[in-house]
């Protein structure tokens, strides 16, 4: 099927993918723009997974001060090369992540960063609450697992729903940018400040 050049251009603007990738996705989707976006997203996730093992030693420190000066965020975002660290898309991602941190107050980057004692304590509290409600031990355990998953979504940046599109997580947002930029990207650390806290 011949693909309209305007459609290719529209898809490219929507996704940031290359012209040939957009053309190929549109051909695969028989001209369906929404399906082509989905195809590119799936390919992007596959690309991001391949790049995830590569070392990130370059990057930037991004500072964000929220309007009114009451909330501030310092973020270290790493990439593979200094060329990418100066890229506008990379800077845009740093700002989006800083906005997320300012709004949603995560405490850790990934679930692996949460100290074991904290996880054990949260699980214990959830189990005890379920038992106090009269739930059997095996049910209390399942409830505790569910509450721990919810806890991770609240305190881990990568697991939080993105504030501008709650259908994707911050980890998925980072993977989209990895696919667009073509390099591994990692949030190394962050610090959120709030006046009076």
Swiss-Prot record:
Keyword annotations: Cytoplasm, Elongation factor, Protein biosynthesis
Function: Associates with the EF-Tu.GDP complex and induces the exchange of GDP to GTP. It remains bound to the aminoacyl-tRNA.EF-Tu.GTP complex up to the GTP hydrolysis stage on the ribosome.
Keyword Plastid: no
Residue numbers spanned by region Involved in Mg(2+) ion dislocation from EF-Tu: 81-84
GO cellular component: cytoplasm
Keyword hit for Methyltransferase: no
Protein name in UniProt: Elongation factor Ts
SUPFAM superfamilies: Elongation factor Ts (EF-Ts), dimerisation domain (SSF54713), UBA-like (SSF46934)
Species this protein is from: Sulfurihydrogenibium sp. (strain YO3AOP1)
